[in-house]
């Protein structure tokens, strides 16, 4: 969990996208914008968390903190998380 800080720092600097596996088109969504993308397995709990996270984004409230909380909760659910980076 040392890399949580690293993820946090990067999420402050860039928008981090939360995607469900089947929504991903890597070429379009990663390379063009050079964003960090967290790809999650498609479970009901993950969907619920994703909706809550996106609600926070819309409200504009403490986004980076919400991202860290979101990822923590996904880990608690033992959700598979893959982090994919766009080309630098």
Residue ranges and their predicted role:
Residues 14-16, 37, 69:
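Intrinsic disorder/low-structure terminal segments
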Residues 30-52, 58:
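Acidic, low-complexity, intrinsically disordered interaction modules
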